[in-house]
Amino acid sequence: MPLRLTLTGLASQYIHMPLAPFCLKRAVDGSLPDVTTTICDLNINDTQEDLLHRVMATEPDVLGISLYIWNRECAARLIRRVKALKPEMIVIVGGPEATFSVEETFREMPVDYLLRGAGEESLPALLRLIMGGGDASAVPGACFRTADGLHISLPAPAPAPRSDLYDETWHSALNGRMAYVETSRGCPFQCAFCLSGHHHKVALDTLGDCKQSLSLVGQEPDLRHSNKEAPDARTVQFMPVDEALALLIRIGNSGCDTVKLIDRTFNCSKVRTMVLVRGLINAKQQGEIGDVCYHFEVAADLFDDETLDLLATAPAGLFQMEAGLQSFHAATLDACDRHTDMAKLVDRIRRILRPNNIHLHIDLIAGLPEEDFVTFGQSFDNAFSLHPHQLQLGFLKFIHGSKLRMEKWGARFAPDPPYEVLSTPWITYTELRRLHDAAEAVERIHNSGRFALAENLALEYTGMRPFSLYLLLGEKMAARQGRWSLDNLTRLVYDVFLCLGVPEHALRDAMITDRLATDNTGYLPPFLQHEDASAVKKAARAYREAHPGCGYPRVAVLSDGSAVVATWTKKHPVTQRGEVAAFCGK
């Protein structure tokens, strides 16, 4: 009999478009012509009433929801409402939050089936049984209630990603949003706080063609990060590299600004990395790719000289990278099964940053084992000294299935998603709260790029450690309730830096230049404006006379009477700062 299936991933924000529903739709459409599949584009910021209305509008017989730490609670409420309204509707859940918490999921949600592991094969098999009858225990990964309790299966294996997923349905749904793309599954490493490397098998034969093309036969994924006990057990499923390159080029022309690869370690194979990087650089240079940025998660210490030399030739802004340091503390890295040559990693990060053509993020995680407040501060200072474009401070999540959640090491964490650390034997709840405040300050002040000159000036004049400075800024921000406008934040930074002894004239000039470089309106808050408004008007008039047709220039007068202008004709593709130049304003 015909069946109507509705799939949703319940994204955390509208800009994020989960891949799982599209993977599953493709799998179902290809094998079950009697099933009509609809993807319901929902996110957790919608009201429960709206979520229910939009699901019911698709008139499903079966509802499938992917569970993650960001949507589990919202999904549970939605499922309870769906079942209250239409008890006969069959609800199937999957995803990591289902795979690794089977009993909890059945206890908390009135679901009919739970699929562990990859669903591309198991979902069509289960739907076939729902339509025609049969024993669901034969379906890989299928879990369900029985008269005796629960039938729990082992997770279904994951197939390699497929490029045909990204069809017209996917492109239409994209609609200018960030494009998430998967060209590999799994990870060759087994970090104790993560799931990606723990449940996959290797399929390296897909690299055959690119090995020959580069004369680099025999270079497999590098396992230097990983637990040395059993490296052969940790592997990756790759999309064929030529197929992956063609896909990335095609999506680069889809109209999106950013193509974000969700591959856990993009550069785990040097051969594959070289093929994809060189191919994208060539495509950009030949005009086959528009104004788009490709975002990769990398293990920076795996880059060798040849790969770094190639990356240095990339057009500015083509690539963005996220390097997960997590910590500089050796005991912490060891406790997390991360065996990293830190000196090499630091060198590689500096070499990536040197040409200023790649936007680089560095990640730190607070709450890891063996890491106290002092050693985290040292990690912060070490990471900050590398001058990444963004320094991201995260907090340990005790996700289901991770080694750190399963081990008994005295940590306390929130019982509800995202299961964030509350305290450990090494760091207190109060200290973690201070780090949360500092993280907010880092995100709004450092990572925004809006205060780069002022920040450098404050560190230079005060001699403060970056960690101490951002603890202070976080404390001041936390003491002030309410929303932060740009002007309010600028005032807070100005006041804090002034109290620390930064000379007023130098600080004002730095903040004026920062503002003009990052805000194309040219507006300055009153406390940064020159006291003589006529001097600013005179400077603007002088610039217009020297540059006919320039429109209304964004001009400011500095403390010494000199003038600067932001033309915004040149915005750096990596820093996104506009050009601010001095000129004679007399």
Segments (PLM) and residue ranges:
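Residue-level signal for short, function-critical loop segments
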Residues: A11-Q13, I69, T265, A300
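Radical SAM [4Fe-4S] cluster-binding motif and immediate context
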Residues: S163-N356
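N-terminal [4Fe-4S]-dependent radical SAM core
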Residues: M1-L5, A136-V139, C143-T183, L214, ...
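Radical SAM enzyme core and accessory elements
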Residues: M1-L10, D34-T36, Q48, L52, ...
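Glycine-rich beta-alpha loop elements in corrinoid/cobalamin-binding modules
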Residues: R4, G9, A20, A27-G30, ...
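A structural motif corresponding to the C-terminal lobe/cap of the Radical SAM core domain
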Residues: P2-L3, L10, E59-P60, F238-V241, ...
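Short N-terminal binding/cap micro-motifs at the start of the first secondary-structure element
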Residues: Y14-A20
